[in-house]
A protein has these predicted regions:
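Post-signal-peptide N-terminal segment of Sec-exported extracytoplasmic proteins
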Residues: 26-68
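Residue-level marker of regulatory loop/turn positions in helix-turn-helix DNA-binding domains and
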Residues: 22
Protein backbone atom coordinates (compact mmCIF):
# COMPACT_ATOMS: atom_id res chain seq x y z
CA UNK A 1 0.00 0.00 0.00
CA UNK A 2 2.86 2.39 0.83
CA UNK A 3 4.54 1.65 -2.51
CA UNK A 4 1.30 2.32 -4.36
CA UNK A 5 0.87 5.64 -2.52
CA UNK A 6 4.44 6.73 -3.29
CA UNK A 7 4.02 5.72 -6.93
CA UNK A 8 0.74 7.64 -7.17
CA UNK A 9 2.39 10.77 -5.75
CA UNK A 10 5.29 10.49 -8.19
CA UNK A 11 2.98 10.00 -11.18
CA UNK A 12 0.81 12.95 -10.10
CA UNK A 13 3.90 15.15 -9.71
CA UNK A 14 5.17 14.14 -13.14
CA UNK A 15 1.82 15.01 -14.72
CA UNK A 16 1.42 18.33 -12.93
CA UNK A 17 1.00 21.37 -15.12
CA UNK A 18 4.11 23.57 -15.00
CA UNK A 19 3.39 26.89 -13.30
CA UNK A 20 5.24 29.97 -12.07
CA UNK A 21 6.71 30.05 -8.58
CA UNK A 22 7.04 32.96 -6.16
CA UNK A 23 10.13 35.10 -6.67
CA UNK A 24 12.24 35.59 -3.55
CA UNK A 25 13.14 39.27 -3.88
CA UNK A 26 16.58 40.20 -2.62
CA UNK A 27 17.73 36.57 -3.01
CA UNK A 28 16.87 35.21 -6.48
CA UNK A 29 19.17 36.10 -9.34
CA UNK A 30 18.11 37.08 -12.86
CA UNK A 31 18.76 34.22 -15.29
CA UNK A 32 19.71 36.73 -17.98
CA UNK A 33 21.80 39.55 -16.48
CA UNK A 34 22.69 37.74 -13.20
CA UNK A 35 21.68 40.70 -11.01
CA UNK A 36 19.77 40.09 -7.79
CA UNK A 37 16.03 40.60 -8.32
CA UNK A 38 15.02 43.37 -5.92
CA UNK A 39 12.05 45.37 -7.25
CA UNK A 40 8.85 43.38 -6.67
CA UNK A 41 7.01 45.46 -9.30
CA UNK A 42 9.16 44.14 -12.17
CA UNK A 43 9.97 40.44 -11.70
CA UNK A 44 9.31 37.98 -14.54
CA UNK A 45 9.47 34.23 -15.10
CA UNK A 46 9.77 31.70 -17.88
CA UNK A 47 8.41 28.22 -17.12
CA UNK A 48 9.66 25.35 -19.29
CA UNK A 49 7.58 22.37 -20.33
CA UNK A 50 9.46 20.28 -17.77
CA UNK A 51 8.58 22.72 -14.97
CA UNK A 52 11.94 24.48 -14.68
CA UNK A 53 11.38 28.11 -13.65
CA UNK A 54 13.77 30.81 -14.88
CA UNK A 55 13.52 34.16 -13.11
CA UNK A 56 14.21 37.67 -14.42
CA UNK A 57 14.41 41.12 -12.87
CA UNK A 58 12.46 42.85 -15.65
CA UNK A 59 10.32 42.21 -18.73
CA UNK A 60 13.25 43.26 -20.92
CA UNK A 61 15.53 40.56 -19.46
CA UNK A 62 12.80 37.95 -20.10
CA UNK A 63 12.46 39.22 -23.69
CA UNK A 64 16.23 39.24 -24.27
CA UNK A 65 16.52 35.70 -22.89
CA UNK A 66 13.69 34.67 -25.23
CA UNK A 67 15.62 36.14 -28.20
CA UNK A 68 18.88 34.46 -27.24
CA UNK A 69 17.40 31.04 -26.37
CA UNK A 70 14.91 30.14 -29.12
CA UNK A 71 15.57 26.46 -28.40
CA UNK A 72 14.06 26.70 -24.89
CA UNK A 73 10.92 24.54 -24.63
CA UNK A 74 8.61 27.15 -23.13
CA UNK A 75 5.39 26.32 -21.35
CA UNK A 76 4.61 29.91 -20.36
CA UNK A 77 6.08 33.36 -19.71
CA UNK A 78 4.96 35.60 -16.84
CA UNK A 79 5.48 39.19 -15.72
CA UNK A 80 4.60 41.00 -12.52
CA UNK A 81 1.54 43.22 -12.63
CA UNK A 82 3.05 46.60 -11.67
CA UNK A 83 -0.05 47.70 -9.76
CA UNK A 84 -0.56 44.38 -7.98
CA UNK A 85 2.83 42.90 -7.02
CA UNK A 86 3.75 40.10 -6.63
CA UNK A 87 0.87 38.92 -8.88
CA UNK A 88 2.24 37.23 -12.01
CA UNK A 89 0.30 37.40 -15.28
CA UNK A 90 0.92 35.70 -18.61
CA UNK A 91 2.72 37.93 -21.10
CA UNK A 92 -0.07 37.34 -23.61
CA UNK A 93 -2.58 38.84 -21.15
CA UNK A 94 -0.41 41.78 -20.09
CA UNK A 95 0.07 45.12 -21.73
CA UNK A 96 3.36 46.95 -21.44
CA UNK A 97 4.06 50.63 -21.03
CA UNK A 98 7.25 51.92 -22.62
CA UNK A 99 7.84 55.28 -20.95
CA UNK A 100 10.91 57.25 -19.83
CA UNK A 101 8.78 58.47 -16.91
CA UNK A 102 8.55 55.00 -15.36
CA UNK A 103 12.01 53.48 -15.07
CA UNK A 104 12.40 49.72 -15.00
CA UNK A 105 15.36 48.02 -13.27
CA UNK A 106 17.31 47.48 -16.50
CA UNK A 107 16.72 50.93 -17.96
CA UNK A 108 14.66 50.08 -21.05
CA UNK A 109 11.64 51.51 -19.21
CA UNK A 110 9.19 48.66 -19.77
CA UNK A 111 6.46 48.11 -17.20
CA UNK A 112 3.76 45.39 -17.27
CA UNK A 113 0.13 45.94 -16.32
CA UNK A 114 -2.62 43.35 -16.07
CA UNK A 115 -5.83 45.30 -16.48
CA UNK A 116 -6.62 46.61 -19.96
CA UNK A 117 -9.13 48.99 -18.40
CA UNK A 118 -6.20 50.88 -16.83
CA UNK A 119 -4.44 51.71 -20.12
CA UNK A 120 -5.82 55.23 -20.47
CA UNK A 121 -5.07 56.14 -16.85
CA UNK A 122 -1.53 54.74 -17.12
CA UNK A 123 -0.86 56.68 -20.33
CA UNK A 124 -2.23 59.87 -18.74
CA UNK A 125 -0.03 59.37 -15.67
CA UNK A 126 3.25 58.43 -17.34
CA UNK A 127 3.03 59.09 -21.08
CA UNK A 128 4.77 56.78 -23.50
CA UNK A 129 3.36 54.00 -25.63
CA UNK A 130 1.47 50.77 -24.98
CA UNK A 131 3.02 47.58 -26.37
CA UNK A 132 1.94 43.96 -26.63
CA UNK A 133 4.39 41.16 -25.80
CA UNK A 134 5.30 41.01 -29.51
CA UNK A 135 6.01 44.74 -29.34
CA UNK A 136 8.27 44.17 -26.33
CA UNK A 137 10.16 41.44 -28.21
CA UNK A 138 10.60 43.82 -31.15
CA UNK A 139 11.81 46.69 -28.96
CA UNK A 140 14.29 44.52 -27.05
CA UNK A 141 15.47 42.98 -30.33
CA UNK A 142 16.21 46.43 -31.78
CA UNK A 143 17.49 48.19 -28.66
CA UNK A 144 19.54 45.41 -27.06
CA UNK A 145 20.11 42.40 -29.28
CA UNK A 146 20.75 43.96 -32.71
CA UNK A 147 22.59 46.97 -31.31
CA UNK A 148 24.67 44.87 -28.92
CA UNK A 149 24.06 47.30 -26.05
CA UNK A 150 21.98 45.07 -23.76
CA UNK A 151 23.39 43.26 -20.74
CA UNK A 152 24.96 39.93 -21.50
CA UNK A 153 24.51 36.72 -19.58
CA UNK A 154 28.11 37.02 -18.43
CA UNK A 155 27.40 39.15 -15.39
CA UNK A 156 27.07 42.75 -14.26
CA UNK A 157 30.43 43.79 -15.68
CA UNK A 158 28.98 43.62 -19.18
CA UNK A 159 25.97 45.80 -18.41
CA UNK A 160 25.25 49.05 -20.25
CA UNK A 161 25.87 52.34 -18.47
CA UNK A 162 22.15 53.19 -18.32
CA UNK A 163 21.23 50.03 -16.36
CA UNK A 164 21.16 49.88 -12.60
Amino acid sequence: LLRASVLLVLVAAACATPEPQPITYGVDQCDYCRMTITDERYGAELVTRTGLVRRFDSPECLAAYTHEHPEEEVHSRWVTDFRRPPRLIRVEEAYFLHSPNLRSPMGLNLTAFGEAIEQEAVLNSFGGEILSWDGVLGLVGREWIESGTGPSMHGPGAMPAHAH
